[in-house]
Amino acid sequence: MDHNFSCKCIRLRKASNNLTKIYDSALIKVDLKITQFSTLKNIQKLGKTNFKDLSYLLELDRTTVLRNIEKLIKMNLISYKNEQNSKNKIIQLTTVGKSKLREAIIIWEETQHKYIKALGIKNYKEIDTLITKISKINI
């Protein structure tokens, strides 16, 4: 095996998985995963939204978003109902969801601060810039 071989895709996935574990471990205190937190935060950002707009904002395929929101509906954190006089379904936070999100934001901010401190602000900013660039590569 070539010991000099270093697939950046796999290395980025490993780093992403590690970071996901860090945030999931912190958010377990409020019975959420980072993906659920992100979905709730984006629903909060949009206010009342629809499935198409939420999928676009999250940059996820519709199947993944549907699977994620079904879990959040079962947890009574969001509602997904037909808009009056329309076939369009509206997604919004429930009262329970708003409360859970307030708790989760505090934990997320603490975790984010620890992550930045461990990495160093210069590295954090560089990684943020690189993530943006990597996300836009189209070859």
Where are these regions (language model features)?
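Residues at secondary-structure transition points
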Residues: 3-10, 14, 34, 49, ...
